[in-house]
From Swiss-Prot:
Record protein name field: Deoxyribose-phosphate aldolase
EC number per UniProt: 4.1.2.4
Active site: 102, 165, 197
Family: Belongs to the DeoC/FbaB aldolase family. DeoC type 2 subfamily.
Gene responsible for this protein: deoC
Xref: SMART domains: DeoC
Pathway connected to this protein: Carbohydrate degradation; 2-deoxy-D-ribose 1-phosphate degradation; D-glyceraldehyde 3-phosphate and acetaldehyde from 2-deoxy-alpha-D-ribose 1-phosphate: step 2/2
Function as written in the Swiss-Prot or TrEMBL entry: Catalyzes a reversible aldol reaction between acetaldehyde and D-glyceraldehyde 3-phosphate to generate 2-deoxy-D-ribose 5-phosphate.
Amino acid sequence: MTDLKKAAQRAIELMDLTTLNDDDTDQKVIDLCHKAVTPAGNTAAICIYPRFIPIARKTLDELGAEDIQIATVTNFPHGNDDIAIAVLETRAAVAYGADEVDVVFPYRALMEGNETVGYELVKACKEACGEVLLKVIIESGVLADPVLIRRASELSIEAGADFIKTSTGKVPVNATLEAAEIMLTVISEKNTKVGFKPAGGVRDAAQAAEFLGVAERILGADWVSPRTFRFGASSLLNSLLHTLELADAPKRTQGY
């Protein structure tokens, strides 16, 4: 197997296959669950809006794919600074049966100089999650400044995040190698049990390999696993399956 095919295989096993569109329906989520069961193995998770968790759970059970985790989003996509609402949304997501919650850090508050609200919001949402995995989306493409990307990562980890994630996929700049370098370096300094999720903008096996390479250089080859590394993506899967000669070439899309 070529290096590119190896990267494609790994990226599928590390993928949060995502649909977070305003026009999502039960049927689209059912279709997503079927796509997550690929000829190259199951994706690590699917990521959907909270209201679709019950139908996703039913579908995955019917497919015998109980190993696929169900992730959802809260405080999404704008990263508001109302802690009470973020906590209520997170509690509701857990009650729906989410295995993982991706919460948006109040990044605009941080840009305005308020570090406290981000820390407190993540801390409260982690308490609401209990054993459910909490991924914190820092929206690195909007923060832009390396100092802010680093600080959002530090605050999230200090507050109890299980993962730090680059992006919502709802802004012009999503996952970049530069942001990955900063975020993975913070993980190496503060807590190597914390995971990293580049989301949006990873289009093919070659790009996936670049992100995996940064993680391995900073944290070691043994660090990367579904417990510590995920790709958030929708259009990436077809490209990876094409690389593995298991699907036709994907049509060019503007997808996440």
